[in-house]
Amino acid sequence: MYGLLKGKKGIIFGALNDQSIAWKVAERCHEEGAEFILSNAPIAMRMGEIDALAQKTNSEVIGADATSMEDLGKLFDAAIAKFGKIDFILHSIGMSVNVRKGKHYTDINYDWLEKGWDVSAVSFHKVMKTAWEKDCMNEWGSILALTYIAAQRTFPDYNDMGDNKSYLESIARSFGYYW
């Protein structure tokens, strides 16, 4: 490859299996010379194949629930201990119980909506807040979140995830102002 990310260090959230966008991003980052920590929620780590990706990319796996400030604090402390300041963060996290359970948008379960909102969008704010408070980003570093066109248009089967992605994009704009 080209070594575009040689010497760059970061955290990649959300790789579950080889069908995950975060998985493919991690592979490319590794091919381009980056070093990173892989992270996902403990339950997702049990269901997924993240250890295989870690072995393939010579990366460390640190479980963290991205909705937990305590977990994020520990993850970022470990990243700082390993790398010093970091150059990139990828937030590739999303989940809707309403979609999984086949609930129609006009009949969504609000407790599930709240959970999906926290996982899919608010966690991005929590990740950036933790990075901000720990002053762990190198100058000109990048923080990325994956979104979907349903944040801008209606896709009925995407259900409340469209709402979640809209809020994710709003968080990116609002917190991005301060970086």
Describe the role of every protein-language-model region.
Residues T67-K82:
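Conserved Rossmann-fold cofactor-binding substructure of NAD(P)-dependent oxidoreductases
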Residues G14-I21, G94-W179:
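Catalytic loop of short-chain dehydrogenase/reductase
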Residues A54-E70:
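Rossmann-fold cofactor-recognition segment
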Residues Y2-L38:
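Canonical Rossmann dinucleotide-binding motif of NAD(H)/NADP(H)-dependent dehydrogenases/reductases
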Residues E32-I50:
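Conserved glycine-rich Rossmann-like NAD(P)H-binding loop of the short-chain dehydrogenase/reductase
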Residues K9-F13, I89-G94:
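Conserved hydrophobic beta-strands of the Rossmann-like cofactor-binding core
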Residues N58, K85-I86, L113:
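Local beta-strand N-terminus motif with an aromatic residue
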Residues A41, A66, Y148:
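Active-site loop/turn elements of alpha/beta-hydrolase fold enzymes
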